[in-house]
C-alpha cells in the first residue's frame, strides 16, 4: 500500500530533550499528541504534514504548534494557588 501523506511530530520535554514520532495515520498522530498533552510531559509540540504524492512532495507544512506548555507540577501549584479551599 502506498501512503499519500505522513505526519511528523517533534516535541520537547520539560528537561529540554527533543524527540520525534512519525506516522502515516492522522488519528494515531492526534492520539499521541493528546496523550502527551494529558500527561503534561512536554513544553513544546509541533506537528508537520508531508504530502507523499502530488506537487508538494516532501515539503513540510506545520499543522499544529503548541509552545510554553506547563508541567504537571506547575499545573498543580496553579490549582492550589487559585483554589486553596479544595485542598
What do the predicted segments below correspond to?
Residues 1-19, 45-52:
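Short aromatic-glycine-(Arg/Gly/Cys) micro-motifs in beta-strand/loop hairpins
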Residues 5, 20-24, 60-63, 67:
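A general secondary-structure boundary signal
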Residues 12, 19-22, 40-42, 73:
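Intrinsically disordered/low-complexity terminal segments and short unstructured peptides
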Residues 15-31:
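A short, exposed loop/beta-hairpin motif centered on an aromatic-Gly-Thr core
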Residues 37-87:
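Short, mixed-charge low-complexity intrinsically disordered segments
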Amino acid at each position: 500500500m502506498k501512503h499519500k501523506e505522513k505526519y511528523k511530530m517533534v516535541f520537547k520535554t520539560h528537561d529540554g530533550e527533543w524527540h520525534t514520532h512519525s506516522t502515516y495515520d492522522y488519528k494515531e498522530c492526534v492520539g499521541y499528541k493528546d496523550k502527551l498533552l494529558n500527561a503534561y510531559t512536554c513544553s513544546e509540540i509541533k506537528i508537520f504534514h508531508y504530502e507523499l504524492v502530488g506537487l508538494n512532495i516532501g515539503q513540510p507544512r506545520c499543522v499544529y504548534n503548541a509552545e510554553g506548555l506547563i508541567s504537571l507540577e506547575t499545573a498543580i501549584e496553579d490549582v492550589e494557588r487559585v483554589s486553596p479551599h479544595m485542598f
